A protein has these predicted regions:
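Glycine-rich flavin
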Residues: 3-6, 12-123
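A short core secondary-structure module
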Residues: 123-165
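Glycine-rich phosphate/pyrophosphate-binding beta-alpha loops
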Residues: 125-130, 212-216, 323
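Glycine-rich beta->alpha junctions and the first turn(s) of the following alpha-helix
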Residues: 169-258
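Amphipathic alpha-helices that form helix-helix packing interfaces
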Residues: 217, 224-227, 231, 253, ...
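C-terminal helix-coil-helix/basic helical segment that borders enzyme active sites and/or dimer interfaces
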Residues: 236, 240, 258-289, 299-308
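Short, charged, amphipathic alpha-helical segments
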Residues: 244-251, 277-282, 311
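Glycine-rich phosphate/cofactor-binding loops in nucleotide/flavin-utilizing enzymes
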Residues: 304-343
Length: 343
């Protein structure tokens, strides 16, 4: 599937137009890229979620200055984005146990090596796309510094048995987004490359954070699109024969899906006007809550058949729960919104 998507050009969503890609900036490209992910999610949510991480990770290299920056930045940037142009997939393994999704709270460390690379050590999980992605973005604190930075792992020939410092300690066993291969790993001096802005990459998060939340939300709106269509296929011809409870459950769920779709549209417009602010946080939280409630309502309307493994509703109900945990997770989103209200 990933090879087919690369051949179709989807990896170019993480490459700017000046280097032969499709990305023109959030205002021009966020909506069309998100719509691709939304359509894909209606067929395979796990595939779409992993694919959504490709352009969002590469925003760390597409955003900001091109010709300025530290010595070697442009060469580093062109090299990373050139790999995406060649069809390589990028993913992320930045999450860690006990930090609540806050990248700045990382416990991982990195020490410089003689050849200019770094050796990273620490525990990481939620490595979505493990085995499918060629490169993985991560976060660690450089030796002798206080603030974390972005690092890139070349995962193409990296064994998982500990022989090269990387050991899988827990395979992904999620009941939702079951096929994302979001394994947990222990890093012991694994070779990584530091981001070329040398400490400046995390300063880009306020700019790119809304785009990340929007792309993730697109996947879950795609699930809602598919769920609404499937419910109509099953229930449409016998709508008047449904019980009052089934009818009201269906109508309420449809209203909730409509609201989620409007929230998504509002997020897109905010990005297109460069005034995203907390709008995307509100939209992502709204979609997360509405999606869970809507899938529950559709299950009530469809009945016990929705629990069958031959029905997609049971899997969709688990899949949509993931949005609240994706960056920024609910706790951080609430904290940022509260900070804005209190200021």
């Amino acid at each position: 599937d990933f090879e087919a998507l690369a051949r179709a050009g989807l990896t170019l969503t993480g490459v700017p137009t000046d280097l032969g890609g499709l990305w023109q900036g959030p205002a021009q490209s966020a909506r069309p890229v998100a719509m691709l992910l939304r359509k894909l999610a209606g067929v395979d949510p796990s595939l779409a979620l992993v694919a959504s991480m490709h352009p969002t990770v590469l925003l760390m290299w597409m955003t900001g200055t091109v010709d300025g920056g530290p010595v070697g930045w442009k060469k580093h940037r062109d090299g990373v984005l050139g790999m995406a142009r060649e069809g390589h997939w990028f993913g992320t393994i930045a999450s860690e146990p006990g930090i609540g999704g806050d990248l700045l709270a990382t416990k991982a460390t990195a020490r410089p090596k003689d050849d200019g690379t770094w050796g990273m050590s620490g525990d990481k999980f939620m490595g979505s796309g493990s085995g499918m992605t060629s490169f993985m973005m991560t976060v660690a604190v450089p030796e002798g510094e206080q603030r974390p930075d972005i690092f890139l792992i070349d995962a193409r020939d990296l064994a998982w048995d500990g022989s090269q410092g990387l050991k899988m300690v827990r395979p992904w066993d999620g009941v939702g987004m079951a096929a994302t291969q979001s394994h947990a790993f222990r890093f012991d001096d694994v070779r990584v490359v530091r981001h070329g802005l040398l400490g400046g990459a995390l300063d880009l998060l306020p700019q790119i954070g809304p785009v990340i939340g929007f792309m993730f939300s697109a996947v879950f709106v795609g699930i809602l699109d598919a769920a609404a269509a499937e419910a109509k296929r099953i229930l449409g011809k016998r709508a008047l024969q449904l019980s009052a409870f089934e009818q009201s459950s269906w109508i309420k769920a449809q209203n909730q899906i409509w609201l989620a779709q409007q929230a998504f549209e509002g997020m897109a417009r905010s990005l297109e006007t460069d005034a995203a602010g907390t709008d995307v946080l509100h939209g992502k939280l709204a979609i997360a809550d509405l999606a869970e409630t809507a899938l529950n309502g559709l299950s009530h309307a469809v009945g016990g058949a929705s629990l069958s493994q031959s029905s997609p509703f049971g899997q969709w109900m688990q899949d949509v729960r993931a949005l609240g945990y994706l960056r920024p997770p609910r706790a951080l989103s609430y904290a940022r919104i509260l900070g804005g209200l209190a200021s």
